[in-house]
């Protein structure tokens, strides 16, 4: 057991999907995994291990924001030996060419958080995805016919930002979307020498306000990113 995860050693696979919403973790376990067993209910942050196409895979919620995903991802890596971590979550488009329900693969994650600067105040330490996972995910998504964008995202510490226009301006510099977790996940992956990737479904748009989705749709659909994430985890 770790501080926030009740699993015993061996109950978590070495590859895992990390949705922010614990109910999305439950949905993935019930709809994609065979013989799924719940290994964690602490703080209702549900985690499950099962099989996908004969491969042992886990899925666990992380909550919202970089502090929350940092707690769970670190414990999964350090205490349970997880080697491949793929975030599957939602993001808001910052780019006119990126639309609701399309996928974004975060090649890198800029951030307005001090989570990295606290350790490296003298550097702009880049938060980048595992190229191996990124390359596999891109080709899998293309083979499945999914509209997929690859590029930089913004991992923000703030959901209700007072710098709305500044965030939108980033879209003109090629930033695809804004979310709240990828930079922290990539930083931990660099620190502990594991592979990480963030796959997001666009749930709304900061540049096209008429594009949005319902809370129920965000919880129970958006299955494209789940399929890509699972296929990427088991790809040789």
Swiss-Prot record:
Signal peptide limits: none
GO MF entries: purine-nucleoside phosphorylase activity
Catalytic activity: a purine D-ribonucleoside + phosphate = a purine nucleobase + alpha-D-ribose 1-phosphate; a purine 2'-deoxy-D-ribonucleoside + phosphate = a purine nucleobase + 2-deoxy-alpha-D-ribose 1-phosphate
InterPro entries listed in its UniProt record: DeoD-type (IPR004402), Nucleoside_phosphorylase_CS (IPR018016), Nucleoside_phosphorylase_d (IPR000845), Nucleoside_phosphorylase_sf (IPR035994)
GO biological process, one term: purine nucleoside catabolic process
The keyword Magnesium appears for this protein: no
Active site location: 204
Binding site for phosphate: 20, 24, 43, 87-90
EC number: 2.4.2.1
GO cellular component: cytosol
Site residues by UniProt (Important for catalytic activity): 218
Keywords: Glycosyltransferase, Transferase
Keyword Hydrolase: no
Binding locations of a purine D-ribonucleoside: 4, 179-181, 203-204
Family membership noted in the UniProt record: Belongs to the PNP/UDP phosphorylase family.
Stored NCBIfam families: deoD, PRK05819.1
Subunit composition and interactions: Homohexamer; trimer of homodimers.
Function according to Swiss-Prot or TrEMBL: Catalyzes the reversible phosphorolytic breakdown of the N-glycosidic bond in the beta-(deoxy)ribonucleoside molecules, with the formation of the corresponding free purine bases and pentose-1-phosphate.
Name of the protein in its database record: Purine nucleoside phosphorylase DeoD-type
